[in-house]
């Protein structure tokens, strides 16, 4: 952003860090006698004042964004919504691209304010879409509609997101707007995934990746595509090794643009993959890596608790961890979808740990040790034997599990067989050569 001159009474208002006078917020840190309300009044006057000339227009744009940031930080939702409406006459005088960016940024600021009713957020975006339609600003309408699709996903209104996304995708393909198309196809994939339609989710993601290959995609969007790819690989094919690779790419991408919340989510899913790959001992080493050291929080604590339970092969510790971190585990849609698999794996690990010392063991004793119903234990042991995860048999009459000793293969025997086979091939070759000579 180019450096602009400023009036003495505005203290160099602007967003760009390159500006010599700094922003109002920068000035506030050195003027403790002022407060946010003074800044808001000052910026509001600038926003309401008429602008003539390029310098005035530039200052007014910066003032609008700075006022929006302050109102958002103070969670003054109503004031921010009013400001969006009041700036519309000024927006009409701007170029379409510049006005579209300003509106999108202000809407994003408003939507990021916590403790808002979902219907109020939806109403704001729809109102802005209506204004863009009336002003015949097609690009702005399309980008705001894309933002509405994402908002529906954020509010878990997936059935409302899908038809809106489908209509917008058809429209964007006609005008060949690939930037917005990638975003909408990605959101469509997320909606299908959360509705458990993995096939359609994968098709939408494939479309988004195909579109992205034809254009430059910023690191944030590339990271979002990688994150969704990892989620689908883990959900569809249970391919946690490939999923881990995608999550790692997403983590690096988000970290490079300082998207800490999204980077933390990708790191959390990386740890989930390690647990699902039966490598819980690698969780701590992963967290001690240089790139991950600056991240911490309850999400990582939850995954460390799950990994510790997996290392101890304790179903009880696993259940305690899941109960101790409801927001981080039970409310996470990705972790929740793998909860059943995780539970079954932990049950199998705990059963193996309990029966490990025995050749014969009562099923009732195993059930008491693990703390679940005997019939469920018996059913699970039968399944493990059929799946060849356990070498043994059930004596249901006596209520006993007979564990077979797994014979360790004799390496010398196999080596001898290989040697005899090789010698046979040599003898055959010699016989063939001798026959040709004769």
UniProtKB/Swiss-Prot annotation:
It holds the Pfam family RPN6_C_helix. The gene is rpn-6.1. Induction: By daf-16. PROSITE patterns: PCI. Residues 239-408 form the PCI domain. InterPro entries: 26S_Proteasome/COP9_Components (IPR050871), PCI_dom (IPR000717), Rpn6_C_helix (IPR040780), Rpn6_N (IPR040773), WH_DNA-bd_sf (IPR036390). Residues 1-30 are annotated as: Disordered. Component of the lid subcomplex of the 19S proteasome regulatory particle complex (also named PA700 complex). The 26S proteasome consists of a 20S proteasome core and two 19S regulatory subunits. The keyword ATP-binding does not apply. Belongs to the proteasome subunit S9 family. Component of the lid subcomplex of the 26S proteasome, a multiprotein complex involved in the ATP-dependent degradation of ubiquitinated proteins. In the complex, rpn-6.1 is required for proteasome assembly. Plays a key role in increased proteasome activity in response to proteotoxic stress: induced by daf-16, promoting enhanced assembly of the 26S proteasome and higher proteasome activity, leading to extended lifespan. GO terms for cellular component: nucleus; proteasome accessory complex; proteasome regulatory particle, lid subcomplex. Disruption phenotype: Embryonic lethal, larval arrest. One of its GO terms (biological process) is ubiquitin-dependent protein catabolic process. The keyword Iron-sulfur does not apply. Residues 1-10 have a biased composition (Basic and acidic residues). This is Probable 26S proteasome regulatory subunit rpn-6.1. Keywords: Proteasome. GO terms for molecular function: structural molecule activity.
């Amino acid at each position: 952003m180019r450096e602009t001159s400023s009036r003495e009474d505005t203290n160099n208002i602007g967003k760009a860090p390159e500006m010599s006078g700094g922003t109002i917020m920068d000035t506030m840190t050195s003027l403790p006698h002022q407060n946010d309300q003074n800044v808001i009044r000052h910026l509001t006057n600038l926003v309401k004042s008429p602008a003539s000339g390029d310098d005035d227009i530039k200052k007014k744009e910066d003032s609008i964004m700075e006022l929006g940031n302050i109102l958002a930080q103070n969670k003054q939702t109503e004031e921010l919504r009013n400001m969006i409406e009041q700036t519309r006459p000024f927006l009409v005088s701007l170029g379409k691209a510049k006005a579209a960016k300003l509106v999108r940024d202000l809407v994003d600021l408003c939507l990021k304010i916590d403790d808002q009713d979902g219907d109020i957020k939806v109403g704001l975006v729809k109102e802005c879409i209506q204004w863009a339609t009336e002003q015949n600003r097609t690009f702005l309408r399309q980008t705001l509609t894309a933002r509405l699709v994402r908002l529906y996903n954020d509010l878990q209104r997936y059935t409302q997101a899908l038809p809106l996304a489908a209509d917008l995708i058809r429209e964007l393909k006609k005008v060949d707007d690939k930037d917005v198309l990638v975003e909408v196809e990605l959101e469509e994939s997320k909606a299908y995934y959360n509705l458990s339609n993995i096939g359609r989710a994968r098709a939408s993601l494939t479309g988004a990746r195909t579109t992205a290959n034809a254009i430059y995609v910023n690191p944030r969007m590339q990271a979002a595509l990688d994150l969704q790819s990892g989620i689908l690989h883990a959900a569809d094919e249970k391919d946690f090794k490939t999923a881990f690779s995608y999550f790692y790419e997403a983590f690096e991408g988000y970290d490079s643009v300082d998207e800490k919340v999204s980077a933390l989510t990708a790191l959390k899913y990386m740890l989930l993959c390690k647990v699902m790959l039966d490598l819980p001992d690698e969780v701590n080493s992963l967290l001690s890596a240089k790139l991950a050291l600056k991240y911490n929080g309850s999400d990582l604590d939850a995954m460390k608790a799950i990994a510790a339970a997996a290392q101890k092969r304790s179903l009880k510790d696993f259940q305690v961890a899941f109960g101790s971190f409801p927001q981080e585990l039970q409310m996470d849609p990705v972790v929740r979808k793998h909860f059943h698999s995780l539970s079954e794996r932990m049950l199998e690990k705990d059963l193996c740990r309990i029966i490990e010392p025995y050749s014969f063991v009562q099923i009732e004793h195993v059930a008491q040790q693990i703390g679940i119903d005997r019939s469920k234990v018996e059913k699970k042991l039968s399944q493990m034997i059929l799946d060849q995860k356990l070498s043994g048999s059930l004596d249901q009459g006596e209520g006993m599990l007979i564990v077979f000793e797994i014979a360790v293969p004799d390496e010398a025997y196999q080596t001898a067989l290989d040697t005899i086979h090789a010698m046979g091939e040599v003898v055959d070759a010699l016989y063939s050569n001798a026959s040709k000579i004769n």
